[in-house]
């Protein structure tokens, strides 16, 4: 008896990748016109539109006259859309944005009449263990995955409580579009289905479709012909939802960890460090847009300010368009990422303008609002046209401009006389607790050096919690709370990169070049913040490291500035701990997850030789935070860390120049086209920012709030 195969027609639609968005949209119009015609004529029973809504919205923006037909087909359960707005990367998108992705996607899908949803992540580069939990929040109890599944996982399994299907052979199947005889197609499918059957029971799931691919007009006839030739299988065109119904009792195997195994599928982990500028912009936009959203809700409740919900949704759509995996992962052509940068600029414009306009609307001249659910103690930086005395605030710079109270008041127009001094201050906030209504509180108090715990020389900076000192070309860190001393703790190292946008490609013989300290001096002196400027040299690279420390803080803040003139290289900062690193704690979807590592694993000794393999790495994604052995790092858009023996490394820059290098030593099969992308080399000015300190990972949110303060203020 033949096994039943439920096949569903689909297309995987990257809005932009090896072609620009508008170029792909023109292709989308052709593909979807064809699909709608086939659905309306009854030549195909249904079409699953990639688990997202943005592509359909892109189509209807050009062809609004097709909306009635689309609605009809959705109501007839022939066309399935959503639940997501875009197919974002799960490790480079935070939990707030991921929820917004579902919120916006479901809102639109339901407005179009769609009622059936599953978390469809067929091409995502691995899967966060937190995604099933978020799906549950939105009433979704099914998911489809592929990349990152270890070999032990069968076709059907429970992924953190969600009924999940593992696409054993992936989503990409274009055999029905190939120039082959029906006999050749049947032979291929027999072998293909045999592999799926090894991990399935009586019913198999077969995706039919591929990236940006339309449906063959005679697909039903082809399947009918193929069925006559298949020995062990009978293919039925239907939908993923019918498959889930047929196998509803098969979900016995449980797996509750993240899906990042690359033994059988590529997870392309080099994407976490490709085009770091995109990641930095993404982190900044995600932070500020969330802050603006919280503040506009607060303003509506407390001050009856205008609602900006529609503006916030528009900004999140722009941000989510950039978080689609071929966007945020940096593995598209240069023109695509230039457009990404424009969208990021738009999001920043919206977020900053909203915050400042709402501040003007409140009518408050002096206010501090803590929008987090945690008490805040720390230093904030703010601009003001008011010349405060040094007893109130610590001034750190002066420029000229127009006050926000004029710029963001729609009843005022700036004139030449409004162009006046603008001062940048540091202010200390002490034990600012969020009230139930997040209400207005008093002005913070300033500090003076005589009241400060900061101490410094040209080669040392410290407070009551932490000390950094430089001697004999090495940086020593001291945790003054525990008394632990870490000699030669911070180093910079540079490696060759023979890879591409998808994977770092190590040179077998490359041991890396270590940076050397060439100078150290006091950069800034103050009672609230002091800073050193330390210069490093690595070959031809000169790094300027601004190292700042705030009064009473546990965190040293680093701002690394350099002019990158090198190509095809990997630049990292190393932190040399006392013990081999076997476990890390890192941020994932705004929660902390634990990962285990083999500290002795060496990538250069394990490069693949057989076709179709991707090297295992000791790198992992992070969103803003990683910790181990009581040491913590908070970054501003640096999303990749690595473990090597007793060393934790953070990637500052990965310069590469090709989308997919067919000679990449880390991967024996191409992952995309070999298109040259010179802008991925990131030649020119680069800035990397992170903070380090000693604390238990249980206090990770406190560290996050110091670097990403949930504070709105106006002086």
What are these regions (language model features)?
Residues 131-134, 155, 177-191, 231, ...:
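C-terminal (or distal) subdomains of carbohydrate-active enzymes
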Residues 99-137, 190-205:
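CE4/NodB-like, metal-dependent polysaccharide N-deacetylase domain
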Residues 7-23, 165-363, 371, 430, ...:
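Catalytic grooves of carbohydrate-active enzymes
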Residues 1-96, 100, 108-110, 137-140, ...:
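N-terminal catalytic cores of secreted or lumenal carbohydrate-active enzymes
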Residues 69-76, 128-176:
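Surface-exposed loop and adjacent secondary-structure segments within mature catalytic domains
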Residues 89-109, 170-196, 511, 530:
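Alpha-helical scaffold elements lining the catalytic groove of polysaccharide deacetylases
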Residues 52-56, 87-90, 117-127, 208-213, ...:
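Conserved short loop/turn motifs at secondary-structure junctions
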Residues 48-57, 84-87, 119-128, 146-151, ...:
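Short, solvent-exposed turn/loop segments enriched in Gly/Ser/Thr/Pro and often Arg
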């Amino acid at each position: 008896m033949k096994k039943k195969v439920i096949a569903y027609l689909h297309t995987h639609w990257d809005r932009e990748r090896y072609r620009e968005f508008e170029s792909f949209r023109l292709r989308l119009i052709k593909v979807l016109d064809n699909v709608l015609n086939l659905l309306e004529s009854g030549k195909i029973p249904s079409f699953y539109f990639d688990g997202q809504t943005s592509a359909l919205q892109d189509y209807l923006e050009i062809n609004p006259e097709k909306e009635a037909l689309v609605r009809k087909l959705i109501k007839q359960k022939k066309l399935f859309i959503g639940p997501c707005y875009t197919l974002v990367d799960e490790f480079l998108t935070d939990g707030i944005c991921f929820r917004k992705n579902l919120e916006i996607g479901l809102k639109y899908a339901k407005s179009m009449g769609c009622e059936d949803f599953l978390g469809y992540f067929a091409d995502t580069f691995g899967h966060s263990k937190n995604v099933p939990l978020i799906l549950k929040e939105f009433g979704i109890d099914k998911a489809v995955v592929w990349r990152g599944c270890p070999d032990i996982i069968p076709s059907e399994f429970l992924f953190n409580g969600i009924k999940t299907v593992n696409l054993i052979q992936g989503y990409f199947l274009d055999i029905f579009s190939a120039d082959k005889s029906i006999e050749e197609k049947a032979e291929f499918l027999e072998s293909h289905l045999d592999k799926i059957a090894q991990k399935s029971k009586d019913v198999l799931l077969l995706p039919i479709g591929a990236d940006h691919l339309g449906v063959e007009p005679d697909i039903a006839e082809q399947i009918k012909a193929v069925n006559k030739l298949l020995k062990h299988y009978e293919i039925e065109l239907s939908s993923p939802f019918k498959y889930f119904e047929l196998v509803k009792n098969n979900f016995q195997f449980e797996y509750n960890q993240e899906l990042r195994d690359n033994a059988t599928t590529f997870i392309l982990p080099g994407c976490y460090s490709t085009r770091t500028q995109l990641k930095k912009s993404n982190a900044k936009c995600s932070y500020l847009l969330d802050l603006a959203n919280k503040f506009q809700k607060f303003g509506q409740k407390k001050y009856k300010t205008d609602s900006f919900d529609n503006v916030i949704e528009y900004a999140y759509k722009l941000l989510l368009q950039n978080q689609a995996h071929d966007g945020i992962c940096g593995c598209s052509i240069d023109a695509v990422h230039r457009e990404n940068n424009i969208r990021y600029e738009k999001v920043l414009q919206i977020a900053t303008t909203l915050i400042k306009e709402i501040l003007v609307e409140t009518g408050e001249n002096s206010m501090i609002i803590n929008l987090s659910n945690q008490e805040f103690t720390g230093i904030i930086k703010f601009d003001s046209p008011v010349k405060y005395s040094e007893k109130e605030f610590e001034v750190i710079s002066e420029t000229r401009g127009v006050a926000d109270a004029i710029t963001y008041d729609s009843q005022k127009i700036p004139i030449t006389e409004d162009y006046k001094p603008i001062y940048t201050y540091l202010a200390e906030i002490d034990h600012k607790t969020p009230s139930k209504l997040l209400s207005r509180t008093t002005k913070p108090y300033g500090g003076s050096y005589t009241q400060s715990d900061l101490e410094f020389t040209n080669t040392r900076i410290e407070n009551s919690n932490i000390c950094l000192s430089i001697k004999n070309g090495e940086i020593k860190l001291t945790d003054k709370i525990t008394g632990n001393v870490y000699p030669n703790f911070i180093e910079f190292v540079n490696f060759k990169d023979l890879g591409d946008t998808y994977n770092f490609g190590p040179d077998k013989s490359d041991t890396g070049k270590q940076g050397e300290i060439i100078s150290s001096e006091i950069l800034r002196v103050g009672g609230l913040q002091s800073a050193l400027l330390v210069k490093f040299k690595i070959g031809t690279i000169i790094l300027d490291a601004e190292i700042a420390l705030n009064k009473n803080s546990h965190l040293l803040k680093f701002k690394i500035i350099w002019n990158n003139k090198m190509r095809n290289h990997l630049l990292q900062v190393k932190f040399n701990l006392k013990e081999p690193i076997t476990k890390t704690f890192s941020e994932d979807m705004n929660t902390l997850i634990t990962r285990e590592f083999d500290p002795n694993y060496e990538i250069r000794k394990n490069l693949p030789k057989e076709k179709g393999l991707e090297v295992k790495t000791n790198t992992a994604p992070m969103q803003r935070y990683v910790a181990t052995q009581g040491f913590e790092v908070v970054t501003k858009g640096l999303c990749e860390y690595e473990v090597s023996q007793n060393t934790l490394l953070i990637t500052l820059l990965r310069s590469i120049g090709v989308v997919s290098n067919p000679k990449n030593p880390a991967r024996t099969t191409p992952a995309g086209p070999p298109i040259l992308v010179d802008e991925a080399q990131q030649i020119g000015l680069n800035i990397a920012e992170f903070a380090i300190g000693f604390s238990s990972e249980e206090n990770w949110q406190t560290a996050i709030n110091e670097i990403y303060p949930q504070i709105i203020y106006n002086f």
